[in-house]
Each structure stands twice: as C-alpha cells, then as structure tokens.
C-alpha cells in the first residue's frame, strides 16, 4: 500500500504511478510548494512601458521550447499595472497553463506574469530546483496533466489541478545524484549530436 501526504498533515491510501525506493515518498505537490496564477492588466497596450525603469513583462513568447531558463524579456509594463498582475522574483518556477500547457521554466529575472502562467515558489526546503525542473518535465507529471484536463473543451491547467499531482520525492542528497546522472547523460547526447552533424557535413 502507498500513502500520500496532504497539506493538513493527514495521509490517505493512493494509487501511484510506479514503485519507488523505500527512502522516497509519493507526495502531493501542494504539500511542497506554493502555486499562484498570473494576471493581466487590460487593455495591455495601455500598460506597456518604453521607459527603462518599467517592470519586466514575462510572456510565453520570451521562451524557447526545450530551454530551462527565461533570461530576457522583450516588453515592460508600467508600475501602475502591478496591482492587476502578479510580480515574481528570480528563481521562481513558471509553468504554462494553456495552449502548450505544462512546460516548466526557471526565471533568471524579476518581473510580472500574465494569466497564461502559473508561478511555483517556496520549494527550496524539499526540492532541489534542478530536480524540480526535471520532474516537471517528465512523462510521469505530463501524463497526470493530460488526465486532469481530459474531456475539457479548453485544455487549461489551473493551480488546483497542478497542486493535486503526485511527484516522487527522494531525499535531497539523492536528488543531487539524480541531477548529476541526468546532466551527464545529456552531455553525452550533445556529444553524439555534434559528431553526427560533423559526419553529415562530410557526406555533402
């Protein structure tokens, strides 16, 4: 039997995606993080700023699929729009909640987010940020997202749905070993890709 932890500290028997080591736990995401939705001042054109002291306006268009970080933004908004949006700090996780939903990014800038984003914060006590990125990028999480929106006409995630997912939680020391193993494997993939591209060029 497997038991999940809930925000109030209670436990309940749950169905889990797969068996995990004894030192790990299946945990409801809501017990580990804070999740909030962004907001959009409208009409947005009235709040866009040209001045250098404007607030970074972080949009999904500022991302690249497959990238891990958001480093730069194209637009800024006026400070008067802050009470109609959500300001988030560097290090916050962002998750797309509509269109190409379920894509995680880590912020490398402070700024304001619109309602196409969910912001995930206060994870540091239980989750290494790199482990959190890889688990949010995994099939075990994405399959739960798909299940949560199945049957919906508009395929959107909200904070309650994301809070309800189960994630496998290893001890922090083991999270670090998992990160190192993943990043070592990714380096080898990049090396093989470079070698393949060189061979392709030689054949031309």
Show which residues each predicted segment covers.
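Non-catalytic DNA-recognition/assembly elements of restriction-modification systems
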Residues: 7-40, 168-204
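Sequence-specific dsDNA recognition surfaces
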Residues: 9-15, 30-47, 61-90
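Structural signal for hydrophobic
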Residues: 24, 58, 91, 164-165, ...
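Short, glycine-/Ser/Thr-/acidic-enriched flexible segments
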Residues: 25, 34-37, 62-65, 100-101, ...
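Short proline/glycine-enriched turn/loop segments at secondary-structure junctions
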Residues: 47-48, 108, 153-156
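A short beta-sheet element
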Residues: 59-61, 73-137, 158
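Specificity-determining recognition surfaces
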Residues: 118, 138-167
């Amino acid at each position: 039997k497997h038991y999940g932890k809930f925000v109030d500290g209670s436990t309940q028997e749950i169905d889990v995606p797969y068996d995990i080591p004894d030192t790990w736990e299946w945990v409801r995401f809501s017990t580990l993080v804070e999740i909030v939705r962004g907001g959009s001042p409208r009409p947005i054109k009235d709040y866009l700023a040209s001045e250098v002291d404007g607030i970074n306006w972080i949009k999904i268009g500022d991302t690249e699929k497959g990238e891990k970080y958001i480093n730069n933004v194209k637009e800024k908004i006026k400070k008067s729009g802050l009470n109609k949006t959500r300001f988030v700090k560097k290090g916050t996780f962002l998750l797309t909640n509509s269109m190409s939903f379920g894509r995680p990014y880590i912020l490398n800038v402070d700024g304001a987010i619109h309602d196409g984003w969910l912001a995930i914060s206060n994870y540091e006590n239980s989750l290494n940020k790199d482990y959190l990125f890889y688990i949010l990028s995994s099939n075990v999480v994405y399959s739960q997202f798909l299940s949560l929106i199945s049957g919906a006409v508009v395929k959107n995630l909200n904070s309650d749905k994301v809070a309800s997912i189960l994630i496998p939680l290893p001890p922090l020391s083991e999270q670090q070993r998992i990160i190192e193993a993943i990043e070592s494997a990714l380096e080898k993939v990049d090396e093989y890709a470079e070698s393949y591209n060189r061979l392709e060029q030689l054949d031309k």
